[in-house]
């Protein structure tokens, strides 16, 4: 239309309709993007590492620990792994206290057992609600603060390593966050709800530490085995804004944690028959370094935390009387803290879990010595 030309009423109506349509579209897009509030830009993993570096002594000890752990998974060492600790690392003082107690026991069983403390700082939630771990809430009674969470976790990890020389295990709930702690962690677990996720599998393929794949809550072992196969293979994919390639992780392995059927009933999978079946499936797949860790809690114990003692003893008995199991079962995963059971956030009982119930210290110490007695 030429400048100064008049428009008809019909043209004006059509133009106004188009304007309203476009405005409505862009408004909807604006509302959609406004559902995300970009609160603040967080430091990159490298920036966090530069601010809170790993001292040379700790880095050397980590390398030594990693080498020994690798030998357990490749069969070069016959030491037995105990990945043990609280359901969630909720309090720095109590967690450090607990791990220092573990260090005393480790010294007494070091010829047979290699302990990796569970320092779980991310908690998957079935509905997405509730306490999500130290990453989200470094103080469980205060509002979420993810930046402070990253700093608190790194500080806790470094303090544990400095004061005990222990390696550290955590769950990889968010694959994009792994790089914040890749210079510290010595063992990573992929949870039952994450094991089917492609990004978890692909990132695991680029890690040079053991990654344990839990069976899904359904109990379908083929899903877990597919995850192990993916992790043991090389891939090209998008990660943290980079086009990356991985070579595969030959010490990715299985974790049996029990299952839940369609009626909500827990189905254990720690018995001899379950482990034997998994071994046969492993061999058929031709995976490198066949290995399994048995989780004594969760659906294996029906979350009856004291059952972990009986379950551990049964597994150790089977290992003692089966050469196949002796080479295949590399260790146990046990949920343990200072006090028995669990509590609600704010109850204030020192060293008591605020998530799943855990075995208390007295029972834990006794159980570790019992496990050592089973080992030749």
Regions found by a protein language model. Give the residues of each.
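Conserved phosphate/anionic-ligand binding catalytic regions in large, soluble enzymes, centered on
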Residues: 81-91, 356
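Active-site-facing alpha/beta catalytic cores
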Residues: 40, 99, 112-277, 298-299, ...
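Metallocofactor- and cofactor-centric catalytic cores in central/energy metabolism, strongly enriched
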Residues: 62-69, 87-90, 95-99, 106-116
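Internal helix-turn-beta structural module
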Residues: 337-375
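N- or domain-start disorder-to-order transition segments that initiate the globular core
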Residues: 36-74
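Conserved, mostly hydrophobic/aromatic
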Residues: 85, 294, 360
